[in-house]
From Swiss-Prot:
Chain's gene name: metK
Quaternary state and interactors: Homotetramer; dimer of dimers.
Biological role stated in the UniProt entry: Catalyzes the formation of S-adenosylmethionine (AdoMet) from methionine and ATP. The overall synthetic reaction is composed of two sequential steps, AdoMet formation and the subsequent tripolyphosphate hydrolysis which occurs prior to release of AdoMet from the enzyme.
Name assigned to this protein: S-adenosylmethionine synthase
Keywords: ATP-binding, Cytoplasm, Magnesium, Metal-binding, Nucleotide-binding, One-carbon metabolism, Potassium, Transferase
HAMAP family documented for this protein: S_AdoMet_synth1
Top-level taxonomic group: Bacteria
GO cellular component terms, A-Z: cytoplasm
Associated pathway: Amino-acid biosynthesis; S-adenosyl-L-methionine biosynthesis; S-adenosyl-L-methionine from L-methionine: step 1/1
Pfam family, one: S-AdoMet_synt_N
């Protein structure tokens, strides 16, 4: 008898107040890294009606016009008029940025680059699953694609009443851990006052939802389980509706709850912070193990001590789907991936201004050039080292059928 279960993940758009904050923090990081590769950045942002506050610790030789960068980012997101409730041209900008503590710096900055220590203690998780073509869990993948589609339709003017703030949620049905159908959808989008709820619902379903979701999965979803703006009007949104903070959407940023999370946020942190770089490396490791056919699902945990270069632990969980022992997978990881802080930077080419794009629609499952941690360039070597030989036609065919 098949085991049936549900799993739900959510995402939010670039205009959600927490994501506005994340993008501002990462735009500042990018601007600094473009001038100073050795900068240390920990930038936090708060947005609320009529104001932006940036704070944190930044040590750099770069010369940055913080106010201009912040205003441009808000305007690009779509908050460009007081009628929307937030305007990048007129909001107040408060700067409370200081410098990195010398106590932290002495553990991170070393004479020899290879001795660079971790910027903090902590544990980070990476995850991959063969249930989608990007080796990500299906619920978060389609939750992201819904709000990405909302932004695309808003920007191209196809539905001119759309506004920047939006949220999505997708519930999938699984049979024996394989996704087979969509059971429920929530899509809430900010809108201008003149649109009726009936018109909005029909347009959102036809223009945003149906083009994104697999038709065979969507066919199983009952109409009463498609929730479009279920509370009615969503006119007041963005920072006017809610206070936004950097780092408050860490599950949206990662695996939608399908994998564990070490607790550290990403945005606004330069890659010397293992909260960010080791989480990216964890995804890189897990994705390559799954791409190599060594497991169908894989979760990798890496941990560090502040000021220490080598990880304090590396562990793997394949949830019973591994082709070889998990202890052997750990050996392969240690042989094929340099998980020291300097190794993370070099392996994934992280000291670049690439982070604005990561700050909305997820840090993983994005196969664009900036997302080096999504490459599967080590899969063949891992498979050979495991003694499994080249990928079979059977494996290739199964993967080609993923949604």
């Amino acid at each position: 008898m098949k085991e049936i279960r549900q799993f739900t993940s959510e995402s939010v758009s670039e205009g959600h107040p927490d994501k506005v904050a994340d993008q501002i923090s990462d735009v500042i990081l990018d601007a600094i890294l473009a001038q100073d590769r050795r900068a240390r950045v920990a930038c936090e942002t708060l947005v609320k009606t009529g104001m932006v506050l940036v704070a944190g610790e930044i040590t750099t030789q770069a010369h940055i016009d913080y106010e201009q960068i912040i205003r441009e980012t808000i305007t690009e997101i779509g908050y460009n008029h007081s009628e929307i409730g937030f305007d990048g041209a007129t909001c107040a900008v408060v700067n409370a940025i200081g410098k990195q503590s010398s106590d932290i710096a002495q553990g991170v900055d070393r004479e020899l680059e290879e001795d660079q220590g971790a910027g903090d203690q902590g544990m980070m998780f990476g995850y991959a699953s063969d249930e989608t073509d990007v080796l990500m869990p299906a619920p978060i993948t389609y939750a992201h694609r819904l709000v990405q589609r909302q932004a695309e339709i808003r920007r191209n003017g196809e539905l001119p009443w759309l506004r920047p703030d939006a949220k999505s949620q997708v519930t999938l049905l699984y049979e024996d851990d394989v996704p087979v159908a969509i059971d429920a959808i929530v899509l809430s989008t900010q809108h201008s006052p003149e649109i009726s709820q009936a018109t909005l619902r029909e347009a959102v379903i036809e223009t945003i939802i149906k083009p994104v979701l697999p038709a065979d999965w969507f066919a199983h979803c009952r109409s009463e389980n498609i929730h479009v703006n279920p509370t009615g009007n969503f006119i007041i949104g963005g920072p006017m509706g809610d206070c936004g903070l950097t780092g408050r959407k860490i599950i949206v940023d990662t695996y939608g709850g399908m994998a564990r999370h070490g607790g550290g946020a990403f945005s606004g942190k330069d890659p010397s912070k293992v909260d960010r770089s080791a989480a990216y490396a964890g995804r890189y490791v897990a994705k390559n193990l799954v791409a190599a056919g060594l497991a169908e699902r894989c979760e990798v945990q890496i941990s560090y001590a502040i000021g220490v270069a080598e990880p304090t632990s590396v562990s793997v969980n394949t949830f019973g789907t591994g082709r070889i022992a998990e202890s052997r997978l750990v050996e392969l990881i240690q042989a094929h991936f340099d998980l020291r802080p300097v190794g993370l930077l070099q392996m994934l080419d992280l000291i670049r201004p690439i982070y604005r794009k990561t700050a909305a629609y997820g840090h993983f499952g994005r196969e664009e050039p900036e997302f080096t941690w999504e490459q599967t360039d080590k899969a063949e070597a891992l498979r050979d080292a495991a003694g499994l030989g080249p990928a079979t036609a059977e494996i290739i065919n199964v993967r080609s059928e993923r949604h």
